[in-house]
UniProtKB/Swiss-Prot annotation:
<comment type="similarity">
    <text>Belongs to the class-I aminoacyl-tRNA synthetase family.</text>
</comment>
<dbReference type="GO" id="GO:0005524">
    <property type="term" value="F:ATP binding"/>
</dbReference>
<feature type="binding site">
    <location>
        <position position="623"/>
    </location>
    <ligand>
        <name>ATP</name>
    </ligand>
</feature>
<dbReference type="GO" id="GO:0006429">
    <property type="term" value="P:leucyl-tRNA aminoacylation"/>
</dbReference>
<keyword id="KW-0547">Nucleotide-binding</keyword>
<feature type="short sequence motif" description="'KMSKS' region">
    <location>
        <begin position="620"/>
        <end position="624"/>
    </location>
</feature>
<keyword id="KW-0963">Cytoplasm</keyword>
<keyword id="KW-0030">Aminoacyl-tRNA synthetase</keyword>
<dbReference type="InterPro" id="IPR020791">
    <property type="entry name" value="Leu-tRNA-lgase_arc"/>
</dbReference>
<dbReference type="Pfam" id="PF00133">
    <property type="entry name" value="tRNA-synt_1"/>
</dbReference>
<dbReference type="GO" id="GO:0002161">
    <property type="term" value="F:aminoacyl-tRNA deacylase activity"/>
</dbReference>
<dbReference type="InterPro" id="IPR009080">
    <property type="entry name" value="tRNAsynth_Ia_anticodon-bd"/>
</dbReference>
<dbReference type="Pfam" id="PF08264">
    <property type="entry name" value="Anticodon_1"/>
</dbReference>
<dbReference type="InterPro" id="IPR013155">
    <property type="entry name" value="M/V/L/I-tRNA-synth_anticd-bd"/>
</dbReference>
<keyword id="KW-0067">ATP-binding</keyword>
<protein>
    <recommendedName>
        <fullName>Leucine--tRNA ligase 1</fullName>
        <ecNumber>6.1.1.4</ecNumber>
    </recommendedName>
</protein>
<keyword id="KW-0436">Ligase</keyword>
């Protein structure tokens, strides 16, 4: 039984589900559950990272359906934005890597790949490919409601949303510095870059050092140190450009980047080595300083020149010491824990001249000086007389943050200050391959996520939403708190045109904030898009207006309008939104912001579920890294249900996980065992004999059903399916080891319950097993509840004690690295069991050792040992022993045959620890405690 078997089973049941419209959902009198996933960019196949998110959501959808809710799980496709455009243009440019992936990895013909030069054909192809894969994965989707973001009806919906945002003052135009692709010519965000990195734009201060016909605009993040600047450093190997008008000297790389921020006209080029030796003035001190060459200057950073402050910057000291026999150091900041010259001090401490190895030391120095540093009083002596009173009053003796602000103001008043922008977390590359630059864009449309009232409203709204897992809430709050206004349109690409500026396309993170509302009516919108005007959406989504009046304006009947309104009112709000962790920084906050703005607090999503990434070879999987593991490949190789469960049980929800072949194979083997067990059961002769093993089996399943249900409700899916897949099977195996002729009715009931439990995670094999004994779809049966099974506490405590004993023996054998042939077991007397019961009752009542000693009459040392060891007992034993009697000696002797078989030993001898004539082998006789026998392996 290999992947072919599982995939044949999957195909069979997927066809039956589709033919019977099993997952189509309509408003009813039942409690509803509306669940969605972040829709995918249609620029390549679904990969196992998508699979993890979609499978998690599908498990929740199937579980909620089985507990009686009317579940809507729809699906759609994102055509908007640069991910599609950049792939299309890469193919047009003949990008050999991307074309090779499409042909060799994704198995697409070269002729078809050439068609992808048209972005719409690319998107349409992968939309159909993704839909096939989503169906093959067994997602319980209502496919009537699918749409794409370039559907004209969806476009009308988004235009309505944007007009609402603009009316409320949440959209504005502004001039701003943004991450920008110089090749594609539009602003970029996380989804546009290789590695999905959000460009972070940082302001850098520029201080002008002026000479004869040249000005070196030195870029710095620490302008307050200009008092100690005694040189300008450039890269001698770089080419520089003299700028007409300003006489700025910029590296060629800086000239290219800064051309996106300001008007720059080149005068001429000059080699860095030819600039060495020039004299310029420090604008604060007025002193002449020299220009020196240093290999430590990165011509790509800032302006390509830096002011050298060797007293406070190790690399500046290092650079100057390579060209000067003696380096002058001028201290300007005093910091606790450092001497007068922290730059050379840190260099000596680090014991290296490697910039990469120095980075942490330098970062620490910068941080310490910023938060703990104070400007020295004697900096007054470094400036001209006319400036001294200003420096004394505003800068000298001040803490660094305040001094920084005042220094910038002073430089501005001198006309020697400017600002540029840099990508602080660069270099970052667009998906097209170009390095991202900062561009100052004028008259760009922005959504004002930095609006203080809107942000405060959103922060408060977060408290109303369940975040799963809860530890992700802090990251969500941090993302909202840090939110800045965001460019919401582009000049190119697929998507919806901005309603008041048709030269602009709404970007992919702005048309995907309330689209979940569109699902509720998408399957009923066959109308001419022009009819879906603002009055239509106001009525259907907000309940505003009169149906008769809206009908007159739109030509849509009153009955249809009311039906559409009923669809939305029934399904909204969203009950559960599922996405990967990467969307915490953008999409998920945007979702909350926009729901508040459009629908208000009452229609906020009730729950947001966030999962970690799937790694390949230890690295985050990303289309831009070209390390995608396509979902179809995993399914072809291992089968649908094994892949579904492997992705579910491999890690906790928020943790990243590696797609582990060994895990998939283990899941495959376990599913095969359960299937074989069901098939073999169907061939057994009927047997209704009932004894202790049958009572135990049904009782322990009662407890497992309760445990699994609690875990499913809290979305602890990893633990839930590990219990269903492995612990449940061990229970069945133990039952079969206990009896020579199993009760077929009891065993059938146990397997049917297992099929219902596993169904949300492995729905296809669950249907196959269910149909060995039953009609109908297991997907539509009720999820098991504990009340289906009676509990015989006496049977449970006896056989759980035996199973725990088996585990103890296995642990001892494993530690001894020995397979025993014979066992000697010592059990404690019944009086000690009474002490244990009293201790467990006391612990439930939170009594301390002194109180327990008073209750039991036992020494605290003995009780401490008992409490420590009893923690190793299974919870069910600790719970039941308080209520039910247990004769350990009799229980073991009654089940000796089972113990011999399960432990594969030749002989087991059992003694009471208080039996005077019992031999004391290896001192284990006195080691016996209640429920914790002394065990000797031989």
């Amino acid at each position: 039984m290999d992947s072919a078997f599982f995939n044949e089973v999957a195909k069979k049941w997927q066809e039956k589900w589709e033919n019977n419209k099993v997952f189509e959902a309509n408003p009813s009198n039942s409690e509803k559950y509306f669940i969605t996933v972040a829709f995918p960019y249609t620029n390549s196949p679904l990969h196992i990272g998508h699979g993890r998110t979609y499978i998690t959501a599908d498990i929740v959808a199937r579980y909620q359906r089985m507990i009686g809710k009317n579940v809507l799980f729809p699906f759609a496709f994102q055509f908007t934005g640069t991910p599609i455009l950049s792939i299309s243009e890469s193919i047009k440019r003949g990008d050999s890597d991307i074309i090779s992936d499409f042909i060799n990895l994704y198995k697409i013909s070269p002729e078809k790949v050439r068609e992808f030069e048209d972005p719409l054909k690319l998107a349409e192809y992968f939309k159909e490919d993704m839909k096939r894969m989503a169906k093959a994965l067994g997602l319980s989707v209502d496919w009537r409601r699918e749409f794409t973001t370039i559907d004209p009806r969806f476009g009308q919906f988004i235009k309505w949303q944007f007009r609402k945002l603009k009316e409320k003052g949440f959209i504005t135009t502004a001039t701003d510095a943004v991450g920008y692709c110089p090749n594609d010519n539009f602003p970029v965000g996380m989804h546009d870059t290789k590695g999905d990195v959000e460009p972070e734009v940082q302001e850098m201060d520029v201080i002008e050092f002026e000479g004869n016909d040249v000005v070196f605009p030195t870029a710095t993040s620490r302008p307050e140190t200009v008092f100690g600047a005694n040189a300008v450093l450039i890269n001698p190997e770089a080419t520089y450009v003299l700028i007409r008008g300003s006489n700025w000297v910029l590296s060629k790389e800086a000239f290219r980047k800064l051309s996106y921020q300001r008007e720059l006209v080149p005068e001429r080029e000059v080699q860095g080595k030819d600039l060495i030796g020039l004299t310029v003035k420090n604008p604060i001190s007025g002193k002449d300083v020299k220009v020196y060459g240093s290999k430590f200057v990165d011509a790509k950073m800032g302006t390509g020149s830096v002011m050298a402050v060797p007293a406070h910057e190790p690399l500046h000291y290092l650079g100057l010491s390579e060209v000067l026999s003696e380096v002058e150091v001028i201290p300007v900041i005093s910091t606790e824990g450092y001497g007068d010259f922290p730059g050379p001090e840190v260099l000596a401490l680090a014991g290296t001249k490697n910039p990469a190895e120095l980075k942490d030391y330098i970062d620490t120095l910068y941080r310490e000086e910023y938060y703990k540093g104070v400007m020295r009083e004697d900096i007054v002596d470094l400036v001209p007389d006319y400036m001294r009173s200003i420096v004394k009053d505003r800068i000298a003796g001040k803490r660094v943050p305040e001094a920084r602000r005042e220094t910038v103001e002073l430089l501005r008043s001198l006309g020697k200050h400017d600002l540029i922008y840099e990508i602080s977390n660069g270099p970052i590359y667009c998906r097209c391959g170009a390095e991202i630059v900062v561009k100052v864009i004028r008259d760009q449309w922005y959504i004002t996520y930095d609006n203080p009232l809107w942000k405060s409203w959103t922060m408060k709204a977060l408290d109303r939403i369940s975040i799963v897992p809860e530890e992700a809430r802090r990251d969500m709050a941090k993302a909202i708190f840090s939110m800045k206004r965001r460019a919401c349109s582009r000049s190119r690409g697929l998507g919806v045109k901005l309603p008041w500026d048709e030269s602009q396309i709404i970007d992919s993170l702005s048309d995907s904030t309330i689209y979940t509302g569109f699902y509720t009516v998408a399957h009923k919108l066959s109308h001419d898009p022009s009819k879906l005007n603002d009055q239509f959406w106001d009525f259907v989504l907000l309940g505003n207006g009169d149906a008769s009046e809206v009908s007159k304006v739109t030509g849509i009947s009153v009955e249809e309008l009311k039906d559409l309104r009923n669809e939305f009112s029934y399904w909204y709000p969203l009950d559960s939104r599922h996405s990967g962790r990467d969307l915490v920084q953008n999409h998920l906050p945007f979702l909350i912001y926009n729901h508040l703005a459009i629908f208000g607090e009452s229609l906020l999503p009730r729950q947001i579920v966030i999962n970690g990434f799937v790694r390949v070879g230890g690295k985050k999987m990303s289309k831009s890294f070209r390390n995608i593991y396509p979902l179809y490949k995993a399914v072809e190789e291992y089968g649908v249900d094994p892949v579904r469960l492997a992705l579910t049980i491999s890690s906790e929800l928020l943790e990243d996980t590696d797609f582990d072949v060994n895990t998939v194979k283990a899941v495959t083997d376990q599913l095969r065992r359960m299937y074989d067990l069901a098939v073999n059961l169907s061939k057994l002769r009927e047997n209704e004999s009932t004894g202790l093993p049958e009572k135990w089996l049904l009782s322990i399943i009662h407890y497992k059903v309760k445990e699994v249900s609690d875990l499913m409700n809290s979305l602890d899916l990893r633990k839930a399916f590990n219990i269903i897949l492995y612990e449940y099977y061990e229970i069945l195996r133990d039952y079969l080891s206990m009896v020579s002729n199993p009760n077929t009715s009891v065993l059938r009931k146990a397997i049917e319950i297992w099929a219902r439990l596993i169904s949300p995670g492995a729905p296809h094999i669950a249907e196959e097993i269910w149909h060995i004994f039953n009609e109908g779809f297991v997907s539509l049966t009720r999820y098991p509840v504990p009340e289906e099974l009676e509990v015989d506490g006496q049977a449970v405590i006896q056989l759980e004690y035996i199973r725990h004993l088996i585990n103890q023996v296995k642990e001892i054998s494993s530690m001894a690295n020995k397979q025993p042939e014979k066992l000697i077991i010592y059990v404690s007397n019944s009086d000690e069991l009474g002490i244990l019961r009293a201790v467990l009752r006391g612990l439930k009542e939170r009594k301390n050792l002194r109180e327990l000693s008073s209750i039991t009459g036992q020494r605290e040392e003995y009780l401490r040992s008992l409490v420590e060891r009893v923690q190793s007992l299974p919870p069910i034993l600790r719970e039941l022993i308080v209520t039910y009697p247990l004769d350990e000696f009799k229980t073991i002797t009654d089940n000796l045959n089972f113990l011999v078989r399960r432990l594969d030993v030749d002989e087991i001898q059992v003694y009471r620890s208080d039996e005077a004539n019992a031999p004391d082998i290896k001192g284990k006789k006195s080691n016996a405690l209640p429920l914790l026998p002394g065990i000797v392996i031989i």
